[in-house]
């Protein structure tokens, strides 16, 4: 995790977080105490995550502390976040990749990728971003981000770019992966649970089965806009370093000169590939093995690394080695973001936020779209996007019906906004932070991208409503 130095700004952040929390708790503001305490927790954690007065993993325990003192929601819902299935996915993937370090397969994979993709920084950013975007169109974004970040870090360490506090390239590569995994979910209904919430509401509204091709076609303009804007932000971000160490030919020769792959390398690589394949093929066997979810698949294969022996019959991974090299802070940070979402949702703060938006009287269609998109982006940055969809979709439907507007186009626009969160280290954005990315760096770059993407979604959504007669027209069974 990022190193902490007690500068003046950090001391200010240390005091500002709890001070804002107390301010919200003590001043009524016409809101229930539970709602004020939940919103205060959001501000507290946000200040500490960006200002880093303490390690981000420590901040991640604040939902437990606040809920213990104020009883905002059921404590079981908060505590369960720290032992959620996706936490085990991160731990299992981490166990496999530290086995890669011991066997040397990380160098083999890195040299192969560098020989194929090349060492141009912009090319690396584009390839990682597009790979994450396309994969997350069909797969859970946490799985995509965890797998690709692990592989990318192996490559970056190989070319002496593994220290994210010193490297100019590594932060951009990890942002490319996590932003791509975030954006890609919009492309198909399979891109995330938040999309299925939208599908469920559409089926309820129409009284008929939803045809998935409608999603792909009608959300394509916004998907393209989000992808293009985000990629441009990444490529235009100033980076003084234009290439990684070495050349494509150098890495191709290095890869070809490596000794024959050893048994332990094959097994550690196979563990990762099999875990990924079983995760991606989950639909084929989930009826027979309902509890074998991706997190537990990776944990099974990760645990197997303790039993893997090298040619001298010594364990490849010992507990002592794992204890020192596992990214414990990442697990707590990821869980803390989920716990914060549970706190905000369980306290009723999310519903209050959504209702405040619904009360705004608007005559301008484009301003209404802008407010819906902006509100959803802010809320999905704090709570997970599935919870955000569950809370706000009924509000969006109510607003559209109340203003006598077509409902489906506004549902499409709202759905796009659940897939464009970039600033806080919650949800999948905790993964690069766990690898060492500074939360402040993510916040600054993410804020710029959020503003540009919000504007692009607003404009494209408005143009679709105004000039595309088929936007919102569904193929009904």
Predicted feature residues:
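Transmembrane alpha-helix interface/packing and boundary motifs in multi-pass membrane proteins
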Residues: 47-55, 131-141, 178-190, 374-385, ...
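Hydrophobic, membrane-inserted alpha-helices
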Residues: 17-22, 40-47, 128-133, 177-180, ...
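Membrane-embedded alpha-helical segments and adjacent helix-loop junctions characteristic
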Residues: 2, 57-58, 62-164, 323, ...
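C-terminal transmembrane helix pair
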Residues: 161-162, 220-221, 332-340, 344-345, ...
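C-terminal ends of transmembrane helices
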Residues: 44-51, 98-112, 116, 307-319, ...
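Hydrophobic transmembrane alpha-helices of multi-pass small-molecule transporters
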Residues: 1-89, 214-355, 448-454, 458-477
């Amino acid at each position: 995790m990022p190193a902490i130095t007690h500068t003046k700004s950090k001391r200010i952040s240390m005091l500002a977080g709890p001070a804002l929390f107390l301010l919200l708790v003590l001043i009524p503001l016409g809101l229930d105490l539970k709602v004020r305490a939940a919103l205060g927790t959001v501000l507290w954690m946000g200040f500490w995550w960006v200002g880093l007065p303490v390690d981000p993993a420590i901040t991640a325990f604040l939902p437990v502390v606040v809920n213990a003192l104020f009883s905002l929601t059921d404590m079981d819902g908060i505590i369960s976040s720290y032992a959620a299935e996706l936490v085990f996915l991160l731990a299992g993937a981490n166990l496999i990749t530290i086995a890669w370090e011991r066997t040397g397969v990380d160098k083999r994979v890195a040299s192969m990728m560098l020989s194929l993709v090349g060492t141009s920084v912009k090319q690396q950013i584009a390839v990682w971003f597009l790979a994450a975007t396309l994969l997350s169109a069909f797969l859970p974004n946490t799985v995509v981000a965890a797998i690709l970040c692990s592989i990318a870090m192996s490559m970056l360490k190989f070319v002496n770019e593994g220290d994210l506090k010193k490297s100019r390239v590594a932060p951009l590569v990890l942002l490319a992966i996590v932003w791509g995994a975030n954006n890609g979910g919009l492309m198909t209904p399979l891109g995330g649970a938040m999309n299925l919430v939208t599908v469920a509401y559409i089926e309820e509204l129409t009284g008929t089965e939803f045809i998935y091709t409608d999603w792909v076609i009608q959300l394509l303009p916004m998907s393209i806009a989000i992808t293009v804007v985000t990629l441009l932000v990444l490529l235009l971000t100033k980076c003084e370093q234009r290439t990684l160490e070495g050349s494509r030919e150098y890495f191709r020769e290095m890869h070809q000169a490596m000794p024959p792959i050893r048994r332990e390398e094959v097994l550690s690589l196979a563990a990762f590939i099999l875990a990924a394949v079983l995760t991606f093929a989950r639909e084929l066997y989930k009826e027979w093995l309902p509890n074998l979810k991706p997190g537990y698949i990776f944990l099974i294969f990760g645990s197997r690394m303790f039993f893997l022996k090298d040619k001298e019959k010594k364990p490849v991974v010992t507990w002592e080695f794992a204890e020192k090299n596992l990214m414990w802070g990442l697990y707590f940070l990821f869980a803390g973001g989920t716990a914060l979402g549970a706190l905000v949702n369980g306290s009723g703060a999310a519903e209050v936020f959504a209702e405040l938006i619904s009360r705004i009287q608007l005559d301008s269609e484009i301003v209404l779209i802008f407010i819906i998109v902006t509100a959803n982006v802010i809320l999905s940055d704090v709570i997970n996007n599935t919870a955000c969809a569950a809370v706000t979709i009924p509000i969006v439907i109510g607003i559209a019906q109340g203003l006598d507007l077509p409902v489906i186009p506004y549902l499409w626009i709202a759905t796009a906004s659940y897939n464009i969160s970039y600033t806080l280290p919650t949800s999948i954005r905790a993964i690069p932070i766990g690898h060492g990315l500074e939360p402040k760096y993510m916040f600054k770059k993410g804020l710029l991208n959020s503003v540009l993407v919000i504007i692009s979604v607003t404009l494209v959504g408005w143009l679709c409503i105004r000039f595309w007669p088929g936007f919102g027209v569904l193929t009904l069974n």
